[in-house]
UniProtKB/Swiss-Prot annotation:
GO biological process: alkaloid metabolic process
Molecular function via GO: prenyltransferase activity
Positions of dimethylallyl diphosphate binding: R105, K189, Y191, K257, Y259, Y422
Name of the protein this chain belongs to: Prenyltransferase anuH
Top class in the EC scheme: transferase
Length: 451
């Protein structure tokens, strides 16, 4: 059972009593993640109707696929890559512009009865079922490209995957789904982490990615520009692909997002990737804004050398070692995605800094980005963000650790920087179970004292 230490939002308090139990597992996830989501959409200024829609969608379509609740000791059936400790969900808060409001999104890995077994070694059946049920219910959802990548980025002989598992191969997350609650409604995305037979280091050769991509759009000018950068630029050659995302809309409107990891964290390397070696014109003022954002969330001095690597803690969560064994590149360096849009000549590029490893504790990090927003006329929701984070971390104080905030990303727009904070619920953090155990013990003692 999840212990709640703060009053719920009005939307949660109104809806929850009328939603029937779905069993102990789903009830656990609804109480934890449903309240997290309700806090986020309220803090982001969503209308009451929008809050109800987001919560009801989560209850009916996401929570039933979140898998077993953790045991009393925090053990779990399947560890997702979405959280370093195995949480199957990650939230995001896209910061407001000076005249707008934040957007709330979350990404989740569906977990089913056969997850991790010989029947479903890559854990894809629950996601497929969830997506097709949603597509039957939401008319704007189109799974054409999603079905293509399920067919082309994986092998389909389960017996051979079973042999690899018996020989000691480590299988983990291969597909996740994002629900993005924009002011005009729901957007769904599917993210693919390929795992082919014989692939044990988390890296699928770029040629195999391209085999799948060119079947959809053999003459993409934007993708060709990306490959030119990857093949010829010194920084581009260091980028390792690890994930692909698609919008679940009709193919002519869908975009491809190709995710890469770079071992470099110097701002000189960031500049080179974000401009694609000078191919993409980015004003120097925007580059310096990004540099100041990185400094704000990682605790760097404003004059930190542009060609120096950002210092990081050696090991921020021991649980990550075992979970990321085949894709440990995600535990270091910077991340980027290349957005391949229909008809574009060059990709849009988004930058991610993994603040769960770089920078100060969660309290200082949150204050750093809130102050950065305020100093640029975008601070209307800064205090709401800080209060919302405190609501999500009922098991500890923000300043007592790091890892609740996982990434900060930036995408250049014409007039501003699109900035997003990514938040992990720490659903399997030992502190949650210790706190609940103490709470349960106190409650038991009070009951026994009354007899």
């Amino acid at each position: 059972m999840v212990e709640v230490t703060r009053p719920p939002t009005k939307a949660w308090a109104t809806l929850s009593p009328w939603l029937p139990s779905r069993g102990p597992d789903a009830d656990y996830w609804w109480r934890l993640t449903g309240q997290h989501l309700s806090n986020m959409v309220e803090a982001a200024g969503y209308s009451t109707d929008q809050q109800y829609v987001a919560l009801l969608f989560h209850y009916h379509w996401i929570v039933p696929y979140m898998g077993p609740a953790p045991g009393p000791d925090g053990n779990l059936k399947w560890k997702s890559l979405l959280g370093v400790e195995g949480s199957p969900i990650e939230y995001s808060w896209k910061w407001n512009t000076a005249a707008g409001k934040p957007d709330v999104r979350y990404t989740t890995e569906a977990i089913g009865s056969f997850t991790g077994t010989l029947l479903d070694p890559l854990n894809q059946q629950a996601t497929l079922e969830m997506l097709h049920r949603i597509a039957d219910f939401v008319p704007t959802v189109d799974l054409t490209w999603t079905n293509h990548f399920f067919a082309t980025l994986y092998d389909h002989d389960r017996s051979k995957y079973a042999k690899e598992a018996a020989a000691g191969a480590h299988f983990t997350t291969t597909v996740v789904v994002a629900a993005e609650w924009l002011k005009n409604g729901l957007n769904l995305k599917t993210y693919f982490v390929p795992r082919r037979l014989g692939q044990s280091d988390g890296k699928l050769p770029i040629a195999l990615w391209e085999e799948s991509l060119k079947q959809l759009d053999p003459n993409s000018e934007s993708r060709a520009a990306m490959h030119e950068f990857l093949n010829n630029d010194p920084e581009g050659k260091l980028l390792s692909p690890f994930m692909l995302a698609v919008d679940n809309v009709v193919p002519e409107k869908s975009r491809l997002k190709f995710y890469f990891q770079s071992p470099h964290t110097s701002f000189a390397s960031v500049r080179q990737v974000m401009t694609m070696g000078g191919r993409i014109p980015v004003p120097e003022s925007q580059l310096q804004e990004l540099r100041s954002l990185i400094a704000a969330v990682t605790g760097l001095d404003s004059d930190f050398p542009e060609d120096s690597e950002v210092p990081c803690i050696s090991e921020y969560n021991p649980a990550a070692k075992d979970n990321f064994v085949e894709i440990d590149l995600l535990l270091s360096g910077y991340l980027y995605y290349f957005d391949i849009a229909p008809g574009a000549t060059v990709p849009d590029i988004k930058f991610y800094t993994p603040v769960r490893r770089y920078g100060p504790d969660d309290g200082a990090l949150a204050k750093g980005i809130a102050d950065w927003m305020t100093s640029r006329g975008r601070g209307e929701y800064s205090q709401r963000y800080l209060d919302m984070l405190a609501d999500l971390t009922e098991h500890r104080k923000l300043e007592d650790g790091k890892g609740m905030q996982t990434y900060v990303s930036c995408l250049f727009k014409k007039s501003h920087l699109d900035v997003t904070s990514y938040i992990g619920p720490e659903a399997f953090d030992p502190a949650r179970f210790l706190k609940h155990k103490a709470h349960t013990t106190r409650s038991t003692r009070r009951r026994s004292d009354s007899h």
